[in-house]
Design a protein with these regions (language model features):
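Nucleic-acid endonuclease domains
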Residues: 1-54, 58, 63, 69-265
Length: 265
């Protein structure tokens, strides 16, 4: 794949993001120029983000998608940086850009969206596995994370004898030294376990094939407008679709019904 400027795409992270976008976009997978891909993406996506602000893209009137690359054959923890794990994406989230909040104003705007974590294990240019897991199968309610953040912020602000500034981070302390020229930024660095570890009981990882998993709540599956006919891949033993029960991220004493797609090729 070439950039419009004729520069090569930098690294497997970019290639993984194109791969995931193409999976949702269909026809763009046959295009090699990034400007040609962009024209297709603009027909399908209402928002295309950047590496500094979630999400990476939003399907028009559909889910948000956040792409994460792990440079290992399997497993590995996932760095989320300053954004805590999300069961849903909210337009009120201070971590997203204004352009993201306004990306569907022509349809009346949005307040809450499903979010899909697309997590790829890649070495060199080989994709070992790709998870497409809905946040509400994987992450707790936002209050679970906000409570920790607010508790830490309040604790920092109670440190006596220092000067604070307003910040979106956990805190910023000014004039730390006698000259008043040093400051300290305090920021959270969130991370989450790989879904391959979280849902390992449901997996068969014996072969060296590339594996793709899609996990969603059964209630989400029922509401999907268009379900592709995957009979051909099931008959070829490439794909299985199973109803399973997974722990409720908000209360592991309860299970929730879910649908797991497993492909190996």
């Amino acid at each position: 794949i070439d950039h419009h400027s004729s520069n090569r795409i930098n690294g497997v992270g970019d290639l993984l993001e194109f791969y995931v976008k193409d999976a949702f976009c269909g026809e763009s997978s046959f295009l090699e120029k990034t400007n040609e891909k962009l024209s297709k993406y603009q027909q399908v996506f209402s928002y295309l983000g950047n590496s500094n602000n979630p999400p990476d893209f939003i399907i028009r009137r559909g889910a948000a998608v956040e792409v994460k690359k792990i440079e290992k054959v399997a497993g590995g923890s996932i760095a989320l940086n300053s954004s805590f794990p999300k069961n849903y994406l909210y337009s009120s989230d201070s971590k997203i850009k204004q352009s993201c909040c306004e990306c569907e104003n022509e349809y009346g705007g949005w307040e809450k969206k499903d979010i899909i974590y697309a997590i790829g294990n890649v070495t060199d240019v080989k994709l070992h596995s790709l998870w497409l897991v809905y946040g509400d199968c994987y992450c707790a309610d936002k209050e679970s994370y906000e409570r920790i953040t607010e508790t830490m912020k309040n604790g920092v602000n109670e440190i006596p004898g220092v000067q604070f500034s307003e910040t979106k981070e956990l805190g910023r302390i000014n004039r730390v030294d006698p000259l008043g020229i040093t400051y300290l930024r305090i920021r959270g660095m969130w991370g989450i376990e790989h879904p391959g570890n979280v849902f390992s009981n449901y997996l068969n990882t014996d072969s060296n094939n590339t594996k793709i998993y899609v996990l969603m709540r059964k209630s989400t599956y029922i509401t999907l407008d268009k379900k592709p006919d995957l009979t051909q891949f099931i008959n070829q033993n490439i794909l299985t679709i199973n109803e399973i029960q997974i722990p409720n991220p908000d209360n592991p004493a309860q299970n929730i019904d879910a649908i797991l797609y497993r492909a190996s090729f």
